[in-house]
Amino acid sequence: TFEFLTGYADVYCVRYYKASGKISKHIEWMWVMFLDILFGYKDMKIINACIPLIKTNQYKGILCSTYRTFPLTAAKTLAIHTNLPFVVDLRDIIEQYASHEYISHKFHTFSWLDAFITKRFRKRLLRKRNNALEVADCVTTVSPWHVEVLKQYNPNVRLIYNGFDPELFYPQQIKTSRFIITYTGRLLSLAIRNPELLFAAIARLT
């Protein structure tokens, strides 16, 4: 994901998966998920990879940017272990979703069991996130609403709106015979991202 930074900063990759076959990849994914739920496997791998790097480099702080929870536990542990300033950047939070769109994979069990697992999973994610927020030196997020929600767990929450770096992206005027609107996000569900009103408005223009 961060390979584009190569050449500007040192980039290190922590890999969790090695399998290449379709079936073996699925089995490995299930095994890693099992280890992560029981023992925090993914966070431990990050911690073990980062401690030697921190010892041999002059880092000034730890920044963890995430949309859900992972890898906040690893970042929190490293910050406590090294006594470095700890900044958490939350672009999206679980509370903003209408349902369970924040879950990457459905559990595919019985409906009642799915509901039970999802409820427990959500509670676990929020507990781990909030534990990390409580020890953070600063929290940044993207809207006034997000700020108010996160201030329940850390009083030092700063607002930084989403945007783009003008040094990397230059606006251009491109002439075209078609009216083009580009949406670069994901339509996770109609409950929180419903484009029907936009389509209806455009239909009235044509």
Which residues does each PLM region occupy?
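Conserved catalytic-core segment of nucleotide-activated headgroup transferases in glycan assembly
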Residues: 165-206
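Acceptor-binding helix/loop patch of EC 2.4 sugar-transfer enzymes
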Residues: 19-37, 57, 84-126
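Membrane-proximal helix-turn-helix segments that form the acceptor-binding/catalytic region
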Residues: 44, 48, 70, 77-81, ...
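Well-ordered beta-strand positions
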Residues: 10, 137-138, 156
